[in-house]
Amino acid sequence: MFKFRSVLLSLLTTALVAGFASPGSTGETSPGLVGAWIVTVSRPAGVGKNLLTFSSDGTFFRSGDTHPVLSGGHGAWKRVGDREFDATYIAFRFDENRKWIGSTKTRIHIISGPGDNEFTGVAKVSTRDLQDKEVGTSEVRLQGKRIQVEPF
């Protein structure tokens, strides 16, 4: 009976300790991307702004200054290094009459820093038609700043 209690206590202790570990904890040295960011985008046509929100479950959402010709974007992200992340999102494209004409698939590589609330990145954009055939590509530079809660 004593041995059974010891084993049971050991299992409960292990389960309790495991319960306090954060999901996906890898001993990371930076807080990561989770949160909301305002991003300056250097495009071939000029500088623009995007809002990116990275969720802890690996999904993320993008909205930008290209509305109404580009929808909000939905995508996924993951950590690929200590301060490096890759992400992919898809957004729908519309013409000036708001007719659906295709999509964009954007792949992003982000390096966080120099502080915990900044990042730089590169995005490779694939412009696609209604049959999902690539009809153009471009590359843009990103500079992100974490959106912080400000005192009321």
What feature does the model see in each segment?
Residues 47-85, 91-92:
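N-terminal glycine/threonine-rich, aromatic-flanked beta-hairpin/loop signature
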Residues 125-152:
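Edge beta-strand at a domain terminus
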Residues 50-53, 73-79, 103-114, 124, ...:
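Hydrophobic/aromatic beta-strand elements that line small-molecule binding cavities or substrate pockets
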Residues 1-11:
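Bacterial N-terminal signal peptides that target proteins for export
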Residues 30, 57, 78-85, 109-120, ...:
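A short, structured loop/turn motif at beta-sheet edges
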